[in-house]
């Protein structure tokens, strides 16, 4: 992704009033005096409200359709929102704690809107053990028969290799020459094991995506980064996020073989996928210098490890 080769598409922007009108057209009428903005991340606007029957609901919609940034170029937010709807339903049907999907509206001329139950939260966090147990349950499921937005119809190893390489190019554009970086072909070869025994991976397991009450996980949200691949890819991300604690390992029933695999070639390449994303996020999108510097240091460490492997 040195310089995006495709022109960005014209953007239509939508307001809260536009989203509320979609609900009104479908006989779901939020009370305007109850609307309250929630943290929506990068892709979506999220509001809590009460409907005409005084039920607490959450509405989630994009204020524009297309994602254009150095991490993701030309991603369709409508597809992301549909994926969120589908994966919340899938996860809920299989015992993963998630908010219930109330409705999904896709009008021809307005924003698509996802309506969810509102889960009351109190600012507490779940234990790492509970997160480990939940992730183990998720990874034990046969994956749904769908293509995720992040992966499309490509095999996991190639898509992860391609995204890693593109983001390495972005990093070089921003900080200068990295001296050495693996090619897409080299990364694809290292990552080939993630194509076997593929499972649904959430790929953004962090406190911002945990809806909690009384230190219990009540809802796992934001499935935008989901992939279908071998769980080592998610475990590597959790490790680089700093979440692979002994308590998580206990809940997940992490074996010594799983743990050691994270420090071999495939595991290092999986870690690299997360670190390049974080580098671009902190360098180009959030512009957080201290965090960017820490991730750049980690990036160089991982590149050094990969550069000395016999598989390259």
Across the structure, where does each feature detected by a protein language model lie?
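Active-site Asp-x-Gly
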Residues: 198-201, 206-207, 211-263
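Active-site activation/catalytic loop segments of kinase-like enzymes and analogous catalytic loops
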Residues: 232-261, 274-293, 297-304
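Phosphate/pyrophosphate-binding loops and the adjoining catalytic core of nucleotide-dependent enzymes
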Residues: 1-13, 310
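Soluble or luminal CAZymes and related metallo-dependent hydrolases
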Residues: 11-18, 41, 79-83, 127-130, ...
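Conserved catalytic motifs of the protein kinase core domain
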Residues: 54, 111-112, 196-198, 216
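ATP-binding pocket architecture of kinase catalytic cores
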Residues: 36-43, 47-152
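An alpha-helical support segment within catalytic cores of ATP-dependent transferases
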Residues: 14-30, 141-203, 295, 301, ...
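Residue-level signature of transmembrane alpha-helical entry/exit and packing/kink sites
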Residues: 265-269
